[in-house]
Amino acid sequence: MPRLSFLLLGAFCMTTFVTPAIANTDTRAALESVAHLDNYQVVELRRYDIAPGQRDRFVRYFDAYFPEAFEQLDCMVFGQFEDRAAPTKFVWLRGYHDINARPIADAAFYYGPVWREHRVKVNALFPGASDNVLLLHPLAPQTGIPVLPAVDPVDEPHGARGVVVAQIFAVKKGDEDAFAQRAQAAFAHYEGVKVHPTGVLVTLDVPNNFPQLPVRTDGPFLVWLGVVENDAALKDFEASASQVEHALAGTGMLRGAPERLVLDPTPRSRLRWWPAAEAKSSP
């Protein structure tokens, strides 16, 4: 399948979390502390089926052991979430600097000491296959997922807050570029809604270079990500989201109805409604 052009969203306006002109000293320091954690050009959107009644337990294991373990291998856990619509679903986003870094980091983790110590307990919590995985990359350089500072247990004693929304569009082969253009115009309607856009990603059409972890081959897909502050903001946003989905479904370029995930960040998810983000602006 052809790769969606990096050029199509050159003018795409992503609402930023915070700009230097308005950031206070603490905010600038926090952003500078993660400035080296950027340029992740390969992203996995991973969805797991957890055993009934075991998701809270799985979340505690994941939050406690895995984010830093991946970061030490030079990859990134952008965020991890509970799917509101399905009490057995766990969703997370993992990033790599490039496709060649993926098998190196995965081998180091899955054959390394952290996973070897905890895999029996963790695997018991999702006994089914974990192959609902989209291999993606940013549609344009400015539409990658931002790396936010880690949750601060002092300033954020209740953990990550906000609601993450993912819109997933199954695009017909051959219509990738045309659909991206239409999506660009449609997503512009979110500019008047209190939402932080946090990424536009598309299928990465390359062989799976770590076959021990399957990825889906039924693409292409386009994925939009955003964060709202709370349920009230989510309600306001969902009206706009429905309009966008209806408009894009009407293009005739999709293989099925758009899918929308409403995701609650786990306590330690980096991708969240970050307090400093409330002083946001658009470039």
Language model features by range: what are they?
Residues 85-88, 207:
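Short acidic/glycine-enriched loop/turn segments that link adjacent beta-strands
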